[in-house]
Every structure is written in C-alpha cells, then in structure tokens.
Design a protein with these regions (language model features):
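Core RNA-modification/binding signature centered on pseudouridine synthases
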Residues: 1-45, 52-54, 79, 115-203, ...
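Generic marker of residues within folded, mature protein domains
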Residues: 84, 102, 131, 172, ...
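Interdomain boundary/hinge elements
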Residues: 248-254
Length: 254
C-alpha cells in the first residue's frame, strides 16, 4: 500500500487511522512516517508520528492489529516535530527477479560502488522529486545474493526504484514497487533524548500525581486546580524543586 490517503484506495495512513479510531482515539493529527513507502512498496517496520490529546498506552490498546498493519510499540515524545528530519538512517532492500537482470555481477558491483557516497541524486528521482530544493543524499548500495541493499540518510521520491533499474539494467525508469521493502529506520540521538519515560519516585512530592522525564526536562502532572499551589508564591516552590531536578514543566492532568 502507499502511505498517503487516496479515495477508494487502501493506504498505510487510512488503515492506521482506522486502527486508532477502533481504540477510541479520535483526536489526532499530522500522521508522519519515518521511511518513504511508494505505492506497492512493503515495509517490515516503519515509525509513524502523530500529535494527539489522548495519552495512548500500548498496554491498554484493545486492538493492536488491522489488515496488514500491527502496532508493535508506542513511545511518547514532544509535539509538533518535523519527524522525518529526526531519522538518521533508512534501510531498503530491492529484490528483482534474477531472470530480468541484464547487467553482469561485475557491472552491478561497479555501479553500486560508483553510486555510494554523498552525491546529488537529482537525476534519480521523479518530476515531483526534481522540484525539491535539496537533492544531496548520503547513500551506500551493496549487491549481495541477488538483492540490492540501500542504506541512506534519506531518499528522494522513487529514488531507490530508479537507482535499482540503473544498477541492474542500465535503465533510468523506476522499477516496480512490489520488489522493494523498507526494512527498518534508525532514530537520531536527538529523538532518542526527547522520548518521555514515566518515573517512579521514592520520595513523595506534594500535589504531584505523576512524573515523566526525558534528557531535557521533567514533567510534573498535578490535579486540576493544584498547579498554582505547586509553583508557590512568586514561584518559590518550583524554584526549590528545580534546584533538585533541573528543568521542570508543570501540567494539569486531563
């Protein structure tokens, strides 16, 4: 399936939306994906990012699977991120039927070597991709056991399929998406540091019902009406807490 929603067509986005709604999660927006998947392209795993007012817990989901799509894990991070920018590597495999390959193994390996590295890949994209401002990508391509392995910091529209045809056959048309698989994507350290984890504190902090933290700050959750009391007159209480914990954000529980 393609990622973006099209009328009368199944897509990752529409199926993911259905799965969330099946779990009673109706308020969310901005579904972004970490790795590009064109029409007919498979994905063994991908990362999807949404902004939602719901506190979504993996353990409490009644439905984790829908036709061809399964939620494996949920992490909480910051809102309104440019999510694809926080992914450092994408890994794809293109497995084209051997009988359709025209180039020799030597020629294929030579093409892989020539196309690996930091290059301007404008000629290996679609008309849509040509309109993008930046066409420079850092990519490694290898040919092993009849498959092309692509690893890169990002890929242009149709880039892997056009490069695959050039490497295997010397042709610049995109090969079919059905032979392409997104294998996995790698987080950046920055995104890793933004992920919020629940904290269990031995000492009780008055008015604080729950604590989450990432590498940058703590979030102290309080019941409605208790925020002012936790912060204290002229911020006295929160200043003392910041001396102990560092940066703190105070939020009222919904």
């Amino acid at each position: 399936s393609s990622f973006d929603e099209n009328p009368n067509e199944k897509s990752i986005k529409s199926e993911f939306r259905k799965l969330l709604e099946k779990n009673g999660i109706n308020f969310f927006k901005g579904i972004q994906q970490a790795g590009r998947t064109d029409k007919d392209v498979s994905a063994k795993e991908n990362l999807l990012y949404i902004n939602s007012k719901h506190y979504i817990e993996f353990e409490k989901l009644g439905y984790k699977e829908i036709d061809g799509l399964e939620i494996l894990k949920i992490e909480k991070t910051l809102p309104f991120l440019e999510f694809p920018e926080l992914i450092v590597k994408r890994h794809y495999i293109y497995e084209y039927p051997e009988k359709l390959i025209k180039n020799t193994v030597e020629k294929i390996n030579l093409n892989c070597m020539k196309l690996s590295g930091k290059e301007d890949f404008k000629k290996f994209t679609s008309k849509k991709g040509e309109k993008l401002k930046n066409h420079v990508r850092e990519i490694e391509v290898e040919y092993r056991e009849g498959k092309l392995y692509f690893t890169g910091d990002g890929f242009l529209p149709q880039q892997v399929r056009i490069m695959s045809n050039f490497i295997l056959n010397g042709n610049m048309k995109p090969l079919p998406g059905e032979y392409l698989t997104l294998v996995k994507v790698d987080f950046s350290d920055e995104l890793e540091k933004m992920i919020l984890k629940s904290e269990n504190f031995e000492e009780v902090i008055e008015d604080v019902e729950k604590i989450e933290k990432n590498d940058y700050f703590y979030i102290f959750y309080v019941n409605k009406g208790n925020k002012g009391r936790l912060i204290g007159k002229k911020g006295k209480n929160i200043k003392n807490l910041k001396k102990l914990y560092g940066n703190i954000v105070v939020k009222e529980k919904k």
